[in-house]
Regions:
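Surface-exposed, low-hydrophobicity beta-strand/loop segments enriched in small/polar/acidic residues
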Residues: 1-94
Length: 94
């Protein structure tokens, strides 16, 4: 699979804004911290609409690349929930 434009990786370990402007989620890698099943919720930064939610089993790694245009975050992207995840690497449009 190839992407139509430049992407960048952003590593997050806590809740908060990831990117202020319009962007697309192209892929994600989650690493459990071993303390239980992990959860991450990504929302639009302006209207708090949940656009992606994933769980990762205890002690495991979850990875996915989204086909074609990925998931559009029109108002930017924020992490609203991140529990039992050591780190998340988000692949987004540059």
């Amino acid at each position: 699979m190839s992407y139509k434009g430049d992407i960048k990786s952003v590593r997050v370990t806590a809740t908060g804004a990831v990117f202020a402007g319009r962007t697309r989620l192209r892929g994600i890698i989650l690493a459990s911290d071993g303390g239980g099943a992990g959860t991450i919720i990504l929302q639009d930064n302006t209207d708090s609409t949940t656009l992606f939610q994933a769980d990762v089993p205890t002690g495991d790694v979850f990875s996915v690349n989204f086909p074609e245009d990925g998931i559009l975050f029109k108002g930017g992207m924020k992490v609203s929930t991140i529990t039992n995840i050591d780190a998340a690497t988000l692949l987004i449009d540059n």
